[in-house]
Amino acid sequence: MAITMEAIKKLRAMTGAGLADVKKALTEAEGDMDKAKDILRQKGQAIAAKRADRETANGCVLAKVGDGFAAIIALKCETDFVANNADYIKLTQEILDAAVAAKAADLDAVKALTLSNGLSVEASVTERSGVTGEKMELDGYNVVEGEYVCAYNHMGRNGLCTLVQTNKPAAEQAHVICMQVAAMKPVALDEKSVDPKIVEEEYNVAVEKSKQEQVQKAVEAALKKAGINPAHVDSEAHMESNMAKGWITAEDVAKAKEIIATVSAEKAASLNMNMIENIAKGRVNKFYKESCLLNQEFIQDSKMSVKQYLQAADKDLTIVNFKRFTLVAD
């Protein structure tokens, strides 16, 4: 049967599929609109299955605040060409709108929601995959429940969005802190919010680093005392290349190796652990300052912390929650 242009336009509007694909599906379905939609959907599923191992490094990330509920979501794809497509962005927005309206708790709940096309979110993403020929997947679903939430959408190549919740109305300050979260990548709200395992790991790493530094200082001092430049013997490769250049002799290398082995062992056995632990604690405090939102230097004035900035606006103002998602690994 002849396929009318009206039918083609209608199916394209319903699915977003290409002209050739729509015409082929309608022809195969003998003009049956529902069958043609199923054919296009099956094509999308086949494409998605074939490209399951592809990397989805691009996409669209959006954030939205609703009635007592805010969310971030990402619809990821393979190329920025697809990510920048108006229909692709529109689909991401519709998924986010549905998630916020339904106050979906997690990504599985989002996937089960029904969109305006009558399909589930999951089926709609698969259908769009068939249209574009690229693998697509949902990711980065973060939610904040309650009042006084601000959303920040940074529309750039890194696909970055943030949510910040304050304990009272403070739209201006919340927006500024949204940008702080975007730029400074905090991992926790304050010291109490950091996972104890992370703190323990940071402390242990700091202890080992401090030990190595003290041993290295002792070794360098001993080498200099022996008339050997520490930079010439800091690795086997440097020793070999510096001998070839005539900067040091084989005797210098032998002497340096003996000094390094002896002094390293002696210093490691006699380290002042109280000093080491104090240095490590200082490094953990630095970690807090860099990684905890309220402790961070305020991006607009490094002389104050985020906490001080908030209290300057209102002594009772603080942040109670924040979320951040980006397509680019930090």
Task: Put a short name on every predicted segment.
Residues A2-D330:
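N-terminal assembly/interaction segments in proteins that build large macromolecular machines
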